[in-house]
Amino acid sequence: MTEALYFLDCYLKEFEATVEKVTEGKYIVLDRTAFYPESGGQPSDTGKLVRERDGAEFKVVYAGKFNGDISHEISPEGETGAEGLKVGDKVKGIIDWDRRYRHMRMHTATHVIANVIEKEAGAQITGNQLGLDQSRVDFSLEAFDREKFAEYEKIANEIIAENHSVNLYLVSRKEAEERLSRLTTLAKGFSEEITEVRLVEIEGVTIEACGGSHLKNTGEIKGIKIEKLQNKGKSNRRMYFSLLDQASGLK
């Protein structure tokens, strides 16, 4: 099983690792990685692997988790035409930091605005999808008062400006269940097969189980703007938002 370095240090930009498995010349499993694999509505990290012995670089275009292993999809050969990676090769992993940091800001922002919608409207969060420029939150809500979302945006931005610390904890599922009334805001909850849980606490705001990458404090979000609201039928609603410094003003 790959050691997930991003679990407790989301700011790790580079790391050293050893190649443990190579499939079809382009799917690489390392003993440890800081690359976040696509999951939980958060896209994967990208970046590159640099082989220690000759400096050959391999672009990482996707990372995914399969049976406990995190697989990195790379260009089959080095950008300089070098031979492909082999089991036992020592590599340095380098994360595309701009992409990672954008997703970190989006993910922590999602926790803030989702918590506000839950508390203020009594909504139940049913899904989410992060993007570099815009993210969405899906929720179940019978009475859909669009006018109130301007107030929810204001409350979320007040929380962001208060610069709450964000803490990460890795605990057993039993301990998590003892500490929390629920493991996640998502209605579907967590699989019973999960025995170890990573908790994300925004001090004074919310604490829940989440495996994504997050900021150290809410101030780094800077602010959000709700861009669009959609009625998806019955009680299904969808909200799109962007980071304030990237807001497009879509309606």
Curated annotation (Swiss-Prot):
> In the record's cofactor note, how is the cofactor described as bound?
Binds 1 zinc ion per subunit.
Pfam families linked to this entry: tRNA-synt_2c (PF01411), tRNA_SAD (PF07973)
Question: Which InterPro entries does this one have?
Answer: Ala-tRNA-synth_IIc_core (IPR018165), Ala-tRNA-synth_IIc_N (IPR018164), Alanyl-tRNA_Edit-Domain (IPR053424), Alanyl-tRNA_Editing_Enzymes (IPR051335), Thr/Ala-tRNA-synth_IIc_edit (IPR018163), Transl_B-barrel_sf (IPR009000), tRNA_SAD (IPR012947)
Q: Which UniProt keywords apply?
A: Cytoplasm, Metal-binding, Protein biosynthesis, Zinc
For this record, an example GO cellular component is: cytoplasm
What Gene Ontology terms describe what this protein does at the molecular function level?
alanine-tRNA ligase activity; aminoacyl-tRNA deacylase activity; ATP binding; metal ion binding; nucleic acid binding
Q: Is the keyword Zinc assigned to this protein?
A: yes
Could you name the domain of life of the organism this protein comes from?
Archaea
Q: Which SMART domains match?
A: tRNA_SAD
Disulfide bridge partners, by residue number: none
Q: Its GO biological process terms?
A: alanyl-tRNA aminoacylation
Which cofactor is recorded for it? Zn(2+)
Protein location: Cytoplasm
Q: What PANTHER family does the database record attribute to this sequence?
A: ALANYL-TRNA EDITING PROTEIN, ALANYL-TRNA EDITING PROTEIN AARSD1
Family that this chain belongs to: Belongs to the class-II aminoacyl-tRNA synthetase family. Editing domain AlaX-M subfamily.
Provide the protein name: Alanyl-tRNA editing protein AlaX-M
| Species whose genome carries this gene | Methanosarcina mazei (strain ATCC BAA-159 / DSM 3647 / Goe1 / Go1 / JCM 11833 / OCM 88)
